[in-house]
Amino acid sequence: MRDRLDLLAHDKPIPMHPDKPTYLRPIFEPDCARLGVAALEAGRVPPLVVNWTGDETVSIEEYCTYMAELMGKEPIFKYTSEGTWASLVPDTTFMHEVLGRAEVHWRDGCRALVEQCYPELLKR
């Protein structure tokens, strides 16, 4: 997400997979920290493999448009299969059982990222 934010902030095209929209489940720093502690507590031998992800499904186009709006910008999407991937929406059932749920709403996480990385561009 940070790479796309940097492109937005500098008015550069964002490479996107041509199978649009591209959905994923972003996870943000507070959830990574909290779920990281839960992962350490769940550790065992042999290792337990748990994928981490956010709980909300959102398109890259939607969250980029939202972050661009926060900065008073328009996103520029460049659809290409080179260096991009299609939607990735993993099942969170096992993560919920072992680690718990992600709690940060994607809009709140995006806003926090803009505030942290580009506070001078944030429209108040």
Task: State the predicted function of each range.
Residues 24-30, 55-58, 87-90, 101-104:
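Residue-level signal for the nucleotide or nucleotide-sugar donor/cofactor binding architecture
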Residues 1-24, 29:
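NAD(P)-dependent short-chain dehydrogenase/reductase
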Residues 2, 30, 34, 108-111:
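Short, contiguous clusters of charged residues that form electrostatic/catalytic patches at enzyme active sites
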Residues 7-11, 39-43, 116, 120:
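Generic structural signal for alpha-helix termini and adjacent loop/cap motifs
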Residues 33-86, 92:
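Mid/C-terminal beta-alpha module of Rossmann-like enzyme folds, strongest
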Residues 4, 95-96:
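Structural element of the ATP-grasp superfamily
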